[in-house]
Amino acid sequence: MNLDFIKEESPMGFSTSTCTEFVEVLSSKAPVPGGGGASALVGAVGTALGNMVGSLTVGKKKYADVEEEMWELKKKCDQLQKDFLHLIERDAEVFEPLSKAYGMPRETEEEKAEKARVMEAALKEACSVPMEIMEKCCEAIELIVEFGAKG
């Protein structure tokens, strides 16, 4: 179901805001960012920390035997980090229609039915990004464990 009709054109930009700005908006009553965006941010920070281990490991004689593997891990973490940052924005985008759907009128039976239909579609869409964030977190954990074992 296309929910574009209840979206407003508004640039989010949460992934490029300062930490202070993000946390201030997160702590407000604004509908976004929310838990999904915060989770994606934590995922990006976690992968960045894994990459830090990789950066501190490559180029050292002591770790020469795992250097190629570390570069490959860093490459994978770089991509996950980008994915997480994108998911901050994506979570806000998919939550906006749900937020608006909550405010739909429900006076008549037709309005109630329409709201229920829109809510179901909006809920499915809004849940898709947190699910993707969880999947990416599982990928990141595997990489972090490998960084820890080799770095």
Label each residue range with its predicted role:
Residues 2-12, 114, 118:
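Long, contiguous binding/interaction regions
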Residues 52-64:
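Transmembrane signal-anchor/signal-peptide helices with a preference for the extracytoplasmic
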Residues 91, 95-151:
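Amphipathic alpha-helical interface segments
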Residues 61-103:
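A structural-propensity feature for long, helix-poor, extended segments
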Residues 18, 22, 45-52, 87, ...:
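Amphipathic, well-ordered alpha-helical segments in soluble domains
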Residues 28-51:
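Conserved phosphate/anionic-ligand binding catalytic regions in large, soluble enzymes, centered on
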Residues 14-33, 149:
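Short, hydrophobic/aliphatic alpha-helical segments
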Residues 41-45, 73, 80-87, 122, ...:
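Amphipathic alpha-helix face/heptad-repeat signature
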